[in-house]
Amino acid sequence: TFDPQGFSLKIFKDRYAFTPEETWQEACQRVAHQIASAESPIKQKTYQDKFYEILSSNYFVPGGRIWYNSGRPNPQLLNCFVLDPKKDSKEGWGDSARAMIITSMTGGGCGDDFSDVRPRGATIAGQRGAAPGAVELMRLIDACAQPVRNGGQRRVALMFSLDLSHPDIEEFLSAKLVKGELTHANISVRSRHTKAFIKAVKEDGEIELHWKGQYKRSIKARILWDTIVKNAYNSAEPGFLNWELVEHESNIHYIEELVTTNPCGEIPLEPFGNCCLGHIVLSRFVVDGEIDYAALGDTIRLGVRFLDNVLSVNHFPLPQMKTKADNLRRIGLGTTALADTLALLGYRYGSEEGNKFIDKLGRFISKAAYEASVLLAVEKGPFPLCHSMKHVESGFMKRMPAKTKSLVMEHGIRNCMLLTQAPTGTVSILSENCSSGIEPMFAPAYERRYWEGDERKMELVFHPLFAKFMSEGKSVDHFVGSQELTVRDHLEVQRIIQRHVDNAVSKTINMPHDYPVEDMEKLWLEYLPYLKGTTFYRESTRGFINANGEVEEPPLKAISLDEAKRRFKESHKTGTEGVMECPSGVCSL
């Protein structure tokens, strides 16, 4: 059984409850009823009960829009979409702004690629003026997001990408260095020829910038790379999208190209594609120090069916989005609480033993999810554009077990792609304050600073699992916080997980503030070919902006393991155990 308490309950009431009086069990019934309505009448009650069981027990937690909008009129249940990249015209500019506004007003984040836009200074047929360029259109879209943010319940979330070969790439790389520019968007460089780019960087070669074969010029690859590294080191942006790997791994390589990712980068998408997200709470499957793989497999199968049903009952912001979802039926089944799971099993996050377990777990989840989708194809039909023989030719499918590939070739598959790893920040707080996604725990303990009226206060907070272990007298020596891991530890975990995920992985590579930029650059270049997307964050490079727009110290300060153990024992002696809830809501995790 599960019932949110403390800060988890606050998140549920503030973010997801239908009314202030709605209970957790009532919300689970509401969601289960909505999603089971996609089933045939004879099966609806059966699957409503099954969905309720995995929701109410906190085995499976769907994306936030599913929690919030299920049961409402014309529910929009999907977290994110990607917009049309074709925008090199007056109509294209207008359509881009309109699509972003309409989608954002339903609560959907938007990914948008601008590589189709002619570069700054290019000629425009029939006009005397020169083209304003891709970055200028980004500024327009970002400006349109401000009133949507002010008028809605959620902050607008955008991803802007530009191809590495676009003539405006240098302007793009520096666009967010100006205060107040592109404040609603994450930005990422998209590279379709990553291996060639890496080779050019190492050999001090050049790459050609061009737009549709025009406006060609050459630039040293090292100049672009150094700018990417420097800006990411100092401001956590841009990210780098290895589109060569994305396309190589894509199961729909025979249908259409992918264009960019959703705002957090966990799903590379085709034009008008969507993120249909749900997460398995891994720590709930640890029983007597082992994973209950039978129960996990059952939940994976129900999770795939649940998310496939979401596509059937969803009300899409734009008709093109519905058409794309109907034709491809892409879903994003992921996990959360990986770090907690490792701790429960006695593994240190980033250790060799822990990584072997992650690899084994990834193989199990991917196989179970794909075979569940094949069973759905037998029952409900494969996705309409499925060509089973071509489907198994993708880079990802070639790594699947022979039996799984044979099943796909024989029956087709219900969902074109199935797996992802999303950040899961808020829904992880909802799920017992568990560790978020595949990230390490922030710290075994930390100080949280917050405002109470005009008074700045601080409280000591222990990670719930750390507190449980300490209270029970168990060893916590394998607990490790994000800041105590090496950069290679972070990258290696992401590399292992990416091999078992057909969509992509959203992970932040954390670095200490004094970490050498030269070391970051070498490791990034080493791991770049194996990761679809990378985002680095150096501690305190962005600061923390409070409600008055002022910069102050971040609200969370990590405490070392030894210090956490000492302060936990002291708090027990004095009867002042650290609070595990956030009274202010400032927590950004």
Task: Report the location of each language-model feature.
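Gly/Pro-rich turn-and-neighbor structural signature
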Residues: 35-83, 91, 208-217, 221-231, ...
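Conserved catalytic alpha/beta cores of large enzymes that bind or transform nucleotide phosphates
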Residues: 131-141, 146-226, 230-231, 238, ...
